[in-house]
Amino acid sequence: MAENVLSAQKRTEQGKGPARRLRQQGLIPAVVYGGKREPTHVALDPATLLKAIETPHKFNTLLELQVDGASKHVLFKDYTVDPVTRKLLHADFLEVSMDQPVKVNVPVVTVGRAAGVAEGGILSVATHAIVVEALPNKIPVRIEVDVTELKIGRSLHVSELKAPEGCKFKFQTDYVVVFVAVPEKEEVAAPVAAAVPGAAPAEGAAPAAGAAAPAGGAAPAAGAAPAKGGEAKGGDKAKK
């Protein structure tokens, strides 16, 4: 990994006021963490920083930071931008030693076309970055995962991947990295038969809500009691 040189100056004032004045001068505040010392607060040119991190590594870019004549190796770790202007407002660096391994997140990139995709499956990436331990100048740009032989319904775990030369995976080995999912089938609702106007309900079925009651002249069922207040015709015959 090639190193880019970045110049900065140490700052003694912290807070919103001093940071605002720095930005008015065309500089931004930054902090260097790590090592056995307290964090170092510096000021630097944002345009120079953006140019220095125009590398495939991005957040793991190794830089030589020169602060008031003293040099230290750092990794670019984080930044803050203005939500409206998108201008760089702040940056964070991690100080490293060139002979001591560090742990960093390295992005996962799939290579090839999965066999399961040709069968109608859907390739999904479950783990987008893997923690890798390596010397600062051996940090890989990406972890390439060959998915060519991956069939539908199958997956690849961290334990099945080969770490780049000079690196160790510091990640749970049983984690799924990529898989080919079985496509979901759309369920088609069964058609509902439309009711025929005037059709009698099935035997034992209750009439639909709002349906008319039986006609007044309809005979009651065998053995049924007469309606309340109605006359029993059989009783009239008995009186005669």
Curated annotation (Swiss-Prot):
It comes from Anaeromyxobacter dehalogenans (strain 2CP-1 / ATCC BAA-258). Residues 230-240 have a biased composition (Basic and acidic residues). Belongs to the bacterial ribosomal protein bL25 family. CTC subfamily. One of its GO terms (molecular function) is 5S rRNA binding. GO terms for biological process: translation. Keywords: Ribonucleoprotein, Ribosomal protein, RNA-binding, rRNA-binding. The keyword Repeat does not apply. PANTHER family: RIBOSOMAL PROTEIN L25/GLN-TRNA SYNTHETASE, ANTI-CODON-BINDING DOMAIN-CONTAINING PROTEIN (PTHR33284), RIBOSOMAL PROTEIN L25_GLN-TRNA SYNTHETASE, ANTI-CODON-BINDING DOMAIN-CONTAINING PROTEIN (PTHR33284:SF1). The lineage of its organism: Bacteria, Pseudomonadati, Myxococcota, Myxococcia, Myxococcales. It comes from the Bacteria. This is one of the proteins that binds to the 5S RNA in the ribosome where it forms part of the central protuberance. Part of the 50S ribosomal subunit; part of the 5S rRNA/L5/L18/L25 subcomplex. Contacts the 5S rRNA. Binds to the 5S rRNA independently of L5 and L18. The gene is rplY. This is Large ribosomal subunit protein bL25. Residues 1-21, 204-240 are annotated as: Disordered. InterPro entries: Rbsml_bL25/Gln-tRNA_synth_N (IPR020056), Ribosomal_bL25/Gln-tRNA_synth (IPR011035), Ribosomal_bL25_b-dom (IPR020057), Ribosomal_bL25_C (IPR037121), Ribosomal_bL25_long (IPR001021), Ribosomal_L25_dom (IPR029751), Ribosomal_uL5_bac-type (IPR020930). The keyword RNA-binding applies. GO terms for cellular component: cytosolic large ribosomal subunit. Residues 204-229 have a biased composition (Low complexity).
